[in-house]
Amino acid sequence: MALELSDIRQQITQIDRSLLKLLSERHRLAFDVVRSKEISQKSLRDVEREQQLLQELVQFAENENYQLEAQYITSIFQKIIEDSVLTQQVYLQNKLNEQRNQNLHIAFLGKRGSYSNLAARNYAARYQKQFVELGCQSFEQVFEKVQTGEADFGVLPLENTTSGAINEVYDLLQHTDLSLVGELAYPIKHCVLVNDKTDLNQIDTLYSHPQVIQQCSQFIHSLDRVHIEYCESSSHAMQLVASLNKPNIAALGNEDGGKLYGLSVLKTNIANQENNITRFIVVAKEPREVSSQIPTKTLLLMTTSQQAGALVDALLVFKKHQINMTKLESRPIYGKPWEEMFYLEIEANIHHPDTKQALEELKNYSNYLKILGCYPSEIVKPVSV
């Protein structure tokens, strides 16, 4: 006799709770691992060990005839490994950089429910900190609140996998004395959010931030005669649509934010790319020390001469010192037509002797060189088998 669906679901619930208990135990062991590495001074990330672990788990499941696909096993344990790595990084960083104020003040673009707000919450949760939300009307205001000390940190979007670089943030970095102290990647899932039951054929006006509009351009072009209203943030768009309460308008934003304003989801997954991710940076008034055991990035701002090959000569310094460059972005120099400055992101800690030597050599090939920040690489690249 077949089991009742309710009985099956009860068994699943019991198994899920057992899984949660085991995951919690594994999470706690990550602290034992990092304390051991703290004594031995071993590197935090051990890619060979991670690959070996995945291979052993896949083989074990096959030997035991668990009927689980290798890809399924690796995807689950890649996430578990990522949690372990980030947990260990946070432990070391908190020991190096004591935060006197337990209630952090974090500035971000928009109101509650904006993507920047959700990213700020994610960052605070990672470091297990309570925080006071400081919503801002512009990226410039985020910088100002940190500069004046009103905020401990500012969280800003730097680039998106669909729309590319956030040029306004890059340009503000040119003129700030703030330091980059962190990064995080946040998955972006745009939705059409409305007040009440309606359908897409009724929608004639869409509200959202320009970046969101750009990231959903293909979906928007598929609609007939729709008008775009640009807002200072996606949360501001949601607030407007909620307050206007009309059946012919919609906001483009995230589902969690929509719930805060009483909006319903009309359509999901409307971004041009399915895997739509925004990389956020975290800025502070003072730099934060990064443990030598942690994978680290450094962002530089540089200008070179206008001679042929000047940029190539500068970049060869990193090749000489075997330093990997993860980002090269150019922006115009205001007041100097056709001249550009370059943002370079490298996988290196500025306190490492080899990095110090490379930066000294780089000065010989640059007219201007500024270190914008050195921070933990918190985007964990998954290993594969």
From Swiss-Prot:
One matching Pfam family: CM_2
**Residue limits of the Chorismate mutase domain?**
1-92
Q: Tell me what reaction this enzyme catalyses.
A: chorismate = prephenate; prephenate + H(+) = 3-phenylpyruvate + CO2 + H2O
Chain ranges of the Prephenate dehydratase domain: 105-285
Residues annotated as domain ACT? 299-376
A GO molecular function held by the record: chorismate mutase activity
Instruction: List the protein's name.
Output: Bifunctional chorismate mutase/prephenate dehydratase
Q: Where does substrate bind?
A: 9, 26, 37, 46, 50, 84, 88
- Keyword Lyase attributed: yes
Q: What is its EC number?
A: 5.4.99.5, 4.2.1.51
What does the record list as GO biological process? Answer: chorismate metabolic process; L-phenylalanine biosynthetic process
Cellular component terms per the entry's GO annotation: cytoplasm
Q: Which SUPFAM superfamilies match?
A: ACT-like (SSF55021), Chorismate mutase II (SSF48600), Periplasmic binding protein-like II (SSF53850)
Keywords of the record = Amino-acid biosynthesis, Aromatic amino acid biosynthesis, Cytoplasm, Isomerase, Lyase, Multifunctional enzyme, Phenylalanine biosynthesis
Which SMART domains does this entry report, sorted A to Z? Answer: CM_2
Q: Which Gene3D superfamilies does the record associate with it?
A: 3.30.70.260, Chorismate mutase, Periplasmic binding protein-like II
The residues annotated as site (Essential for prephenate dehydratase activity) are 278
User: Which locations, inside or outside the cell, does it occupy?
Assistant: Cytoplasm
